[in-house]
Amino acid sequence: ILDVELNTILPTVTISGSVVEAGTGNPIPNATVLFTSPQFDNTLTSDANGLFTIAGFFPGTYDVLAGNWGHRTYCSSGQNVSGGSNINIVLDKGYYDDFALDFGWTVSGPSGNEWEIGVPVSTTNNGQTANPGADVATDCGDKAFVTDNGGGGPWDNDVDQGNTILT
């Protein structure tokens, strides 16, 4: 038996920030804030005062997305996040959902191939694209709501045995 001690190779930091409404500066409670990079994803929720904090965060370059139902999604690519970073996010009022974040949609219906948020996987039929393998380039992030996102032929991962409903 060999005793082994694991050391943290990467340093971690604590970051904090706020989510407020444009024009009023009012805090936005329960806003989702996502820090994403090729190596890490961290999802946070703002508190009743629109504030968030995370300890044990790996510093680096992240895409930052934030949103809340009733506000337009915030997107910032290539943001350097380091120790002591205070990330202040301002959301414009409005109804908008590009599915980069999950705002609580409900999936129902008898089908086994249900809606899910994911990076779209292309399907083809006779060499032609039947379903695209990418999200819309003009919105935040790279995710979309798709049904059974498995790729292959258009009949491999489609909706069978009834409907699947997204509300």
Cite the ranges covered by each PLM segment:
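Short, exposed coil/turn segments at beta-strand boundaries within extracellular/luminal domains
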Residues: I1, G25, G70-Y74, N80-S82
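Short strand-edge motifs at loop-to-beta-strand transitions and within beta-strands
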Residues: L2, N42, G50-F52, S85-I87, ...
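A short, amphipathic beta-strand motif
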Residues: V4, V13-E21, G50, I89, ...
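Structural motif
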Residues: G17-P29, D102-G104
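Extracellular beta-sheet/turn segments enriched in Thr/Pro/Gly and aliphatic residues
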Residues: I1-L10, N80-D98
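A short, solvent-exposed beta-strand micro-motif common in secreted/extracellular proteins
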Residues: F58-G70
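Short, acidic Ser/Thr/Gly-rich low-complexity loop/linker segments typical of extracellular
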Residues: P27-P29, L34-G56, G78
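Extracellular glycan-recognition surfaces and repeat-rich motifs
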Residues: D98-T164
